[in-house]
Curated annotation (Swiss-Prot):
Gene name per UniProt: ycf4
One of the Pfam families matching this protein, by short name: Ycf4
Record bears the keyword Chloroplast: yes
Family (UniProt): Belongs to the Ycf4 family.
Protein known as: Photosystem I assembly protein Ycf4
Record's function text: Seems to be required for the assembly of the photosystem I complex.
Length: 184
């Protein structure tokens, strides 16, 4: 989503609150809880899950391994739920032609760098760069090349834009900023 006028362009960035992240966190939580229940039921010798008898799974080594996978999955699921709760990666890109300033803001993990705020002068922008890597896992990323700072990604690599959409976005942004486009 974006908002645009003659002199200001604001591009809102979605972050980790995506439907796919909710689905993966939920599936991972249920799966790891199931593994932990099976491992615990094999240790205690009781049936917590009525699909099979607890005697079918011996605690050493299958029960230990299933408990380990369950605990590891719960940690990963907790990490995913925390990134969703904190909305890590969300923010905005603000391009202001009137003031000649570019502001990039992203939310990070709690701590010193929770708020990531970058500020550049528009005259320091060298180009808008499109990087396309074709293959099994196609990757298309849009960068802003800053003099003395390097390349700053404007679009995340996991966002599935078509080549045409990336080119369109790069062309509009380059026209707005009055800088050239580079393709790699």
């Amino acid at each position: 989503m974006s908002w645009r006028s003659e002199s200001i362009w604001i591009e809102f960035i979605t972050g980790s609150r995506k439907t796919s992240n909710f689905c993966w966190a939920f599936i991972l939580f249920l799966g790891s809880l199931g593994f932990l229940l099976v491992g615990t039921s094999s240790y205690l010798g009781r049936n917590f899950i009525s699909l099979f008898a607890s005697q079918q799974i011996i605690f050493f080594p299958q029960g230990i391994v299933m408990s380990f996978y369950g605990i590891a999955g719960l940690f990963i699921s907790c990490y995913l739920w925390c990134t969703i709760f904190w909305n890590v990666g969300s923010g905005y890109d603000l391009f202001d032609r009137k003031e000649g300033i570019v502001r990039i803001f992203r939310w990070g993990f709690p701590g010193k760098s929770r708020r990531i705020f970058l500020r550049f002068l528009m005259k320091d922008i060298q180009s808008i760069r499109i990087e396309v890597k074709e293959g099994v896992s196609t990757r298309r990323v849009l960068y802003m090349e800053i003099r003395g700072q390097g390349a700053i990604p404007l679009i995340r690599a996991d966002e599935n834009f078509t080549t045409r959409e990336i080119e369109q976005k790069a062309a509009e942004l380059a026209y707005f900023l009055r800088v050239p486009i580079e393709v790699f």
